[in-house]
């Protein structure tokens, strides 16, 4: 089966997306990370649909041009793409040097029933990429390991991919909080009660967005807060 190991860099040179599949004519092509995951899962259930890729019983929804705060041009959304979910440093893939493997200088449990990817990490190979965390660039083989890990976590641990609200519902969300601030300021005249009400409302907004974040749901936080503050300030200025 045909495949590829290309990375998609954003226009600022940072690697945030994983292109897992696309069609060349009628022929589906799958990424290295997706094919490795398929072999590890020992499944033949892999297919490309117009808006998603299905691996076994897990659906990988396609990243759209207007998905959340991560905006793309139409030319950047070809194929099936997902946002890369980099692990925290203490859960990053373990690395073994060539000499460690040759000399047996490692714990066999590190590789038992695990995916092992062999590649270069030397800077001289110029296979280095910038991640959203900044700092030193990351070798391509480590990026591939991140990609495989994310796919397997999604399938085996049912860890959800990032989900996004439709654009119209994001507008409604921002409008509701903007109007909420206006109503509070218009109806409440006592300064202390007004201040407490606005603080509680802001905390409620941030808490809802945080719960969404923990559930891998992108909810526009900053625009809603700005809308709340803007209408609050406008009504206060009007009343004074």
Per-region residue spans from a language model:
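Transmembrane alpha-helices and their extracellular/periplasmic helix-loop junctions
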Residues: 150-240
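Flexible inter-domain connectors and hinge/loop segments
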Residues: 1-179
């Amino acid at each position: 089966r045909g495949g590829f190991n290309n990375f998609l860099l954003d226009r600022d040179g940072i690697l945030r997306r994983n292109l897992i599949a696309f069609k060349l004519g009628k022929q589906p092509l799958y990424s290295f990370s997706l094919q490795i995951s398929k072999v590890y899962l020992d499944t033949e259930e892999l297919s490309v649909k117009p808006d998603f890729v299905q691996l076994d019983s897990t659906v990988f929804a396609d990243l759209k041009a207007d998905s959340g705060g991560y905006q793309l041009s139409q030319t950047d959304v070809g194929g099936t793409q997902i946002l890369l979910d980099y692990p925290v440093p203490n859960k990053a893939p373990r690395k073994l040097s060539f000499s460690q493997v040759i000399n047996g200088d490692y714990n066999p449990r590190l590789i038992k029933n695990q995916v092992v990817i062999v590649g270069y990490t030397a800077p001289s190979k110029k296979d280095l990429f910038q991640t959203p965390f900044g700092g030193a660039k990351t070798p391509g083989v480590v990026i591939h390991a991140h990609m495989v890990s994310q796919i397997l976590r999604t399938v085996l641990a049912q860890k959800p991919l990032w989900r996004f609200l439709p654009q119209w519902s994001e507008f409604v969300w921002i409008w509701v909080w903007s109007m909420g601030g206006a109503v509070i300021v218009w109806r409440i005249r006592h300064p202390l009660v007004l201040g407490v009400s606005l603080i509680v409302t802001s905390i409620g907004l941030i808490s809802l967005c945080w719960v969404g974040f923990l559930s891998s749901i992108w909810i526009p936080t900053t625009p809603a807060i700005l809308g709340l503050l803007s209408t609050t300030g406008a009504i206060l200025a009007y009343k004074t």
